[in-house]
């Protein structure tokens, strides 16, 4: 689910935090990619196009085709991807997972009804809703990435949290996912639509964490409370409070505790036994592997290994796989070029960096105004300025 309404709220109140760019703009960047989100996109895309990509036994291979060719495209554009896979979901997510299971059951019933009625459009719609990424999909994707020479990380818990940890440690430039909660976990940069197909012609949308905090006039802790009010995967939200009201409450009271002390409960319904404090701590201190100890290496592809893995039972074209392997090798050798900013050391981000910078800017502005006032006073007493 991510964070409900956050993208639009940022677009409305902190548009300076969003920049749209072509993929080539990120040449030379290392990017942590939410692997499960990617695999889901690939499975959904193939269904919507009506294609049937499968092994001789009928097992789907669309996730492998998507991973193979989309990764090649990223590398062709000078981007060095590292894929991050989900671990076990946190206990707090059990409520959201239960809701998803209920929606799945409803979709299965609706699919049966659509099938009985012979409604192709409805059949397609509910088939898409039943798509999910399995452990086998993830296992095969990891094997493919190893053969391609592309690194991956197994997160102990949420992939978005691990991606954010890699960004904060300076290991990668940004998190690439469609889930906005990567920002709630503190990723200083979030890229949306990076792994979309070229045919969709969607520019990459880059969100800056520091700029959105400044635009929304909140610090990192207040931003987390805002996201909980908007609606996250880890607890319920207060009924009746939408994005506009949520940011007003945070700007007025600064935290959920004070909001609850001043909330009109006849107008808004607070969930019983609301776990917002535990959800807050999960965002502040998520379960992640030590990012500073993770060694990311991009190696040469194993062409013969790729042919053996993708061709045969999986029915990929050997010619296309070999051409893909050659592109991988070419892109690896071409990536000796570096971005100019890579010559300067990137320090791991700190949550309050934006506020320190803001204070510094305000002090500089105040100092400049004082100097201007003195200069103006001098001009009044001396020669009339031309």
Swiss-Prot record:
Region described as I-domain: 122-253
Gene Ontology CC annotations of this record: mitochondrion; nucleolus; nucleoplasm
UniProt-listed Pfam families: XPG_I, XPG_N
Region annotation (Disordered) ranges: 351-386
Subunit description: Interacts with PCNA. Three molecules of FEN1 bind to one PCNA trimer with each molecule binding to one PCNA monomer. PCNA stimulates the nuclease activity without altering cleavage specificity.
Interaction with PCNA: region residues: 336-344
Source species, domain of life: Eukaryota
Coiled coil: none
Cofactor: Mg(2+)
Keywords: DNA damage, DNA repair, DNA replication, Endonuclease, Exonuclease, Hydrolase, Magnesium, Metal-binding, Mitochondrion, Nuclease, Nucleus, Phosphoprotein
Name listed for the protein in its UniProt record: Flap endonuclease 1
Xref: CDD domains: PIN_FEN1
């Amino acid at each position: 689910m991510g964070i409900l309404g956050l993208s639009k709220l940022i677009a409305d109140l902190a548009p300076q935090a969003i920049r749209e760019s072509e993929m080539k703009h990120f040449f030379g960047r290392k990017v942590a990619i939410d692997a499960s989100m990617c695999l889901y996109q690939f499975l959904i895309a193939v269904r919507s196009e009506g294609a049937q990509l499968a092994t001789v036994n009928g097992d789907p291979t669309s996730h492998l085709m998507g991973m193979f060719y989309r990764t090649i495209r990223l590398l062709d554009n000078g981007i060095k991807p590292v894929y991050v896979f989900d671990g076990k979901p946190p206990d707090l997510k059990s409520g959201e997972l239960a809701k998803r299971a209920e929606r799945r059951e409803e979709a299965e019933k609706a699919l049966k009804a659509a099938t009985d009625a012979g409604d192709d459009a409805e059949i397609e719609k509910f088939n898409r809703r039943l798509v999910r990424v399995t452990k086998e999909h993830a296992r095969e994707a990891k094997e493919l990435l190893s053969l391609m020479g592309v690194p991956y990380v197994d997160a102990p818990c949420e992939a978005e949290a691990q991606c954010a940890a890699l960004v904060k440690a300076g290991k990668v430039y940004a998190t690439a996912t469609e889930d906005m909660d990567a920002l709630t976990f503190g990723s200083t940069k979030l890229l949306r639509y990076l792994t979309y197909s070229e045919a969709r012609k969607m520019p990459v949308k880059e969100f800056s964490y520091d700029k959105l905090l400044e635009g929304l006039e909140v610090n990192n802790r207040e931003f987390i409370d805002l996201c909980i009010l908007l609606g996250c995967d880890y607890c319920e939200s207060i009924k009746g409070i939408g994005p506009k009201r949520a940011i007003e409450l945070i700007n007025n009271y600064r935290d959920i505790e004070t909001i609850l002390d001043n909330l009109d409960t006849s107008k808004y319904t607070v969930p019983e036994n609301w776990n917002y404090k535990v959800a807050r701590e999960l965002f502040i201190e998520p379960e992640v592997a030590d990012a500073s100890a993770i060694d990311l290496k991009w190696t040469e592809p194993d062409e013969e290994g790729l042919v053996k893995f993708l061709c045969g039972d999986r029915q990929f074209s050997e010619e296309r796989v070999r051409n893909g392997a050659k592109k991988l090798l070419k892109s690896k050798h071409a990536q000796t070029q570096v971005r100019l900013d890579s010559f300067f050391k990137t320090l791991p981000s700190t949550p309050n960096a934006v506020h320190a910078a803001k204070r510094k800017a305000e002090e500089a502005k105040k100092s400049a105004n004082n100097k201007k006032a003195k200069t103006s006073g001098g001009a009044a007493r001396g020669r009339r300025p031309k």
